[in-house]
């Protein structure tokens, strides 16, 4: 079974949404997981906006990338800039999805703006994963 690992720093928002969306988009033939270099918690905003489209992140948790067995991963998908994203798992197929971090520590960001930011990130991730699924399918059939 093919395996995809989504990476970002905190494994809180983008990579968690990508993990949940990836399970739906890639289907049962792909094992999907996520991790970060400084894991924290799954963002309640990520849980909420994914639930809006029927994707449940409830069983997911933030994980440290060092706990992932490198032999269990075929493809690494980074969702943060290379200079801050954990660089790991050499020898694997790598992709970069440039998705802006929707999270903010700014107390002036109101709940509606925060929800809009997370929805925008969710929709960008969904669109890019849909395109990537076709690429992964082609590389699987040509292998």
Cite the ranges covered by each PLM segment.
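Conserved active-site segments centered on acidic
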Residues: 1-66
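Short, flexible active-site-adjacent loop segments at beta-strand->alpha-helix junctions, enriched
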Residues: 10, 61, 81-83, 100-103
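Conserved small-residue
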Residues: 11, 50, 76-77, 125
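Short glycine/proline-enriched coil/turn segments at helix->beta-strand junctions
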Residues: 27-29, 72, 89-93
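Short, charged/polar "capping" segments at the starts of alpha-helices
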Residues: 40-42, 83-86
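S-adenosyl-L-methionine/SAH cofactor-binding core of RNA-modifying enzymes
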Residues: 57-68, 73, 79-84
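Redox-cofactor binding/interface segments in oxidoreductases and associated redox assembly factors
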Residues: 78-79, 96
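Phosphate-binding/catalytic loops
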Residues: 84-143
